[in-house]
A protein has these predicted regions:
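Extracellular and secretory-pathway beta-repeat/beta-biased strand scaffolds
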Residues: 1-243
């Protein structure tokens, strides 16, 4: 499915569902609810695989690809990329209302544009890389099996922000929470030149940690680091500081 030209205005319908192996968004999509479900097989409307289909054609590089001039604008947006190893790319704008945004990808999630919601945002992928802007006016959750790469990027939520991955790379990046910032990395966190900020507090659990960036919280900062720890930047807590 390719959206081009004047785009797709489904704002007068209750819901817009796009189901295909790959979806290219080169123009705007407007609706109250948008579901984009991609992959090879038979799926129910929740995006679950209910039957397989044989194919000998090569996999696309991106199963959901929003170009710089493309965008999705809806009260609720749900993107599900089911094909193994095939990811989701956004170079445009994906903007949801109070009902929020969820993205689930069985590959890489690459954000080069703007991802925003008046409600909550949940992003889950094998790997998450952002060089653009991610902002939720509600809670924000990022979950990756491999690395979350937030270098030179700004990722924020007005509510709790939860970040979980094998490794978190926040060099020259910003991870900001209007409430509690919780980070868990099984292997390593790099915050060289970066900023971790939690209004209510900041929690960090990892095996090793490095960087000269800032850790700031108006409440408590609590860090559990099982192995190597090298930090040369500021660490300021309005409450307890527990290492």
């Amino acid at each position: 499915i390719r959206i081009e030209g004047d785009g797709m205005d489904a704002s007068r319908t209750a819901q817009a569902d796009l189901l295909a192996r790959a979806v290219e968004v080169n123009a705007g999509i407007w609706a109250d609810k948008v579901n984009v479900i991609t992959g090879v097989g038979q799926f129910d409307l929740e995006g679950r695989l209910v039957g397989s289909l044989p194919t000998d054609s090569p996999s696309p590089e991106w199963s959901i690809d929003t170009a710089e001039l493309g965008g999705m604008y809806a009260n609720k947006i749900r993107l599900v990329a089911n094909e193994h190893g095939v990811g989701v790319r956004n170079a445009g704008t994906v903007s949801a209302g109070q009902s929020g945004l969820t993205v689930t990808a069985d590959g890489r999630l690459l954000n080069q544009g703007t991802v925003a919601a008046q409600g909550a945002i949940g992003l889950q992928a094998q790997q998450i890389t952002t060089s653009g802007d991610i902002h939720a006016e509600g809670a924000l959750a990022l979950d990756a099996d491999a690395t979350i790469d937030n270098r030179d990027a700004r990722t924020s939520g007005q509510g709790n922000v939860t970040v979980r991955a094998d490794a978190i790379d926040n060099r020259d990046g910003e991870l900001l929470a209007g409430a509690q910032l919780n980070m868990t990395a099984d292997r390593h966190i790099d915050n060289d030149g970066g900023l971790f900020f939690g209004t209510q507090g900041l929690s960090l659990v990892t095996d090793s940690m490095a960087g000269n960036g800032q850790w700031l919280a108006q409440g408590e900062i609590e860090a559990t680091i099982h192995g190597d720890y090298r930090h040369q930047g500021e660490m300021i807590a309005g409450g307890n500081l527990v290492l």
